Amino acid sequence: MFGNEMDDTRDPLQYGYQRVNTGEGSLSTSTTGTSLDTIVLDTNAEDLNSTPRVGAQRTFSPILETDDTNPFLDPPPPGQKSPPAVGEAKAKSKSSLKGSRVSFDQEDRFDETDEGFRKQREHFQKHKSHSTSEHKNQLIKELRHLLAADNRRQFQGKKHVSLDVQSSKVLEELLKASSSEDDFEGQRKQFQERKHKSLDARHISFKFEKEPTPSSSEEDFEPSTSLLKIDADITKPVIIDLKVNRAQSDQALTQFQKNLAHFQDLESSEDEDYISSRKHFQQAKSMSTDSRKSNKSIRFFEMEMGTKEENIRTAVPFVRQITEDGKPKLEVYRPTTNPIFIWTQVLAALSVSLGSMVVGFSSAYTSPALVSMKDRNITSFEVTDQSGSWVGGIMPLAGLAGGILGGPLIEYLGRKNTILATATPFIISWLLIACATHVAMVLVGRALSGFSVGVASLSLPVYLGETVQPEVRGTLGLLPTAFGNIGILLCFVAGKYMDWSGLAFLGAALPIPFLLLMFLIPETPRWYVSRGRDDRARKALQWLRGKKADVDPELKGIIKSHQDAERHASQSAMLDLMKKANLKPLLISLGLMFFQQLSGINAVIFYTVQIFQDAGSTIDENLCTIIVGVVNFIATFIATMLIDRLGRKMLLYISDVAMIITLMTLGGFFYVKNSGQDVSQVGWLPLAAFVIYVLGFSLGFGPIPWLMMGEILPGKIRGSAASVATAFNWSCTFIVTKTFADIINAIGTHGTFWMFGSICVIGLAFVIFYVPETQGKSLEDIERKMMGRVRRMSSVANIKPLSFNM
């Protein structure tokens, strides 16, 4: 493309300038350097004095390239005339340029003398096309404004959905290429390569025509090395490398409106280059607003990221073809409502939560039942204080056994089947208690009930953690705790009007609706994947997410997570638990369980009536227990509304601080009362403190340890680790409830509450420094973060579709 250096005294007839026909006008070029700015000229080819029009052409059609066999003629010595060589040179030049859009000017316009050549050269230098630095800067501004600012901004606003609404062929290719996330990534890269060149002004290439005609001094026509990158092979296109930074782009935007208005005046529907470029861009950009739209019904698959709003930048669009009546139908899915309104997902959460209501009823049973059970006018057998303590304490002890066995059960039987299997033991246990003729029958019934409670308390959070979407896992994940509190409230209210036997019959009826609803919901997809039953996993996930949801991305993530866990798993489950990556989430879960029970909540629930009797409150003790139960119930529903807004840790902070204040207050009240002072004026204080204490506990430390157990434990060890955590929880429950009376006798009621308050202070520090926030994260994200690997959060929310015609 560039000739040899020449002296100023070359023959203009033999080595004349050439004029290149671009289709938009003519531009003058030389072999030493083609004026960069001529690519936007529209001049009169016959009049070098005409004023150039800048910005007349936005896009450029490919310019035909000639072969690289054309020899460059060596210039004659200065002053030498070679008229006979003119015809030969012209013939060779025309032969080498065959197929190129190059036209020679009339040769008689140039003088044959050296003086004439110099005049012509000066005339050309004076009028050549925008070769000054000022005009080059203008070119850069034009390119930056029109290419970078306009189209790139529009494209980024509409994002990458590479659908061609004008060509069914392009759409069908995209549909095939977007069948999976990996395929889509490859398709997306191709799309980035073929998208409109104006989207990135840093990488714009133009082809110049090859011209064999040498020019004069190279120093007069030195190309701008800051803008041009010239390959050794002159047949390759010249690359214009525009270094556009943010500051330059911002500065350029100030003149964008003027340039755009000028550009719009120059646009023409008859311009073939513009039409070609526009069609290409229409194929690449998102949801063209072109009037030439397809009549087909198109449906986009988009994904909702995070917990609060759509994150279009990181969302991956998915498109699939739906067959209707044997004919392909293209439809578009758009994210619409909150996942909380997917009724199948809510039904699954409600079904397992009814089991939690039975658990809550079982836990609260001893508080109202022991009073009537010790009454010989009601009970045919004697219940001593020692046997009464075992009626309250044997349930958590049996729950310990249930927690230990529950881990293997949910792995081998499945999450759903394990929960379902607890219904029958619940019914049998309550019937044993209701029909008891000896305290031993009551103990056996309580033990069987406690075993079922241990299994259920382990399997319920695991089931919900594996089926509910991350966006609403906090809200729906707290439903078991809320229904557990309903069970507690129901037991307290019924206990005011029923004796221990009637309460037991009521308890036997509660598992029946729970049993029936459990048959309607599926097993968790993750358990199916762990058993190699991917087809069943897909069906279960489809049921949970809705019939029209695209579950492929989520299913793929579940399978990948399971495969990663399998690669790092050992033969021994205990060895897996002891691995550093698994030990950290297990210890956090154990810590939460420890501080939950050592806050004294179960001791308070089990002995609520007795505590109010000891306090000497003027309010009826049974009414006090009902009030506490109502507050417990309401607080949990408040937590369900706040947990996905404030996060897990914030609710734990609030919960811990509330318990610390109220436990210390209760300790102070009992200290003053036991010292012999009159506390009748503040008889309301125990109830107020209890209400705030239960309110604080139910907001955080009540439901969140169980919720986070199902979230932070790795999938491969979730069953065994949850078994350990549940067993540990019930061990702490047993220790607290069984020793509560002994601790009161040893250090007094006031000392007992102060002890629990001090433990809550330590629990607050534990939450601050060790407990992670899991709000809005998928189980796979949480697992990778707990293992120390950082990854981009991915979340799959398959939303009810909204179809519209384009």
UniProtKB/Swiss-Prot annotation:
Residues 1-339, 411-424, 469-473, 523-585, 644-649, 703-723, 772-806 are cytoplasmic. One of its GO terms (biological process) is trehalose transport. Residues 1-34, 48-138 are annotated as: Disordered. InterPro entries: MFS_dom (IPR020846), MFS_ERD6/Tret1-like (IPR044775), MFS_sugar_transport-like (IPR005828), MFS_trans_sf (IPR036259), MFS_Trehalose_Transporter (IPR050549), Sugar/inositol_transpt (IPR003663), Sugar_transporter_CS (IPR005829). This is Facilitated trehalose transporter Tret1. One of its GO terms (molecular function) is sugar transmembrane transporter activity. The chain crosses the membrane at residues 340-360, 390-410, 425-445, 448-468, 474-494, 502-522, 586-606, 623-643, 650-670, 682-702, 724-744, 751-771. High-capacity facilitative transporter for trehalose. Does not transport maltose, sucrose or lactose. Mediates the bidirectional transfer of trehalose. Responsible for the transport of trehalose synthesized in the fat body and the incorporation of trehalose into other tissues that require a carbon source, thereby regulating trehalose levels in the hemolymph. The keyword Lipoprotein does not apply. The lineage of its organism: Eukaryota, Metazoa, Ecdysozoa, Arthropoda, Hexapoda. Residues 361-389, 446-447, 495-501, 607-622, 671-681, 745-750 are extracellular. Pfam families: Sugar_tr. Belongs to the major facilitator superfamily. Sugar transporter (TC 2.A.1.1) family. Trehalose transporter subfamily. It is found in: Cell membrane. Keywords: Cell membrane, Glycoprotein, Membrane, Sugar transport, Transmembrane, Transmembrane helix, Transport. It comes from Aedes aegypti. It comes from the Eukaryota. Residues 25-34 have a biased composition (Low complexity). CDD domains: MFS_GLUT6_8_Class3_like. Glycans are attached at residue 377. The gene is Tret1.
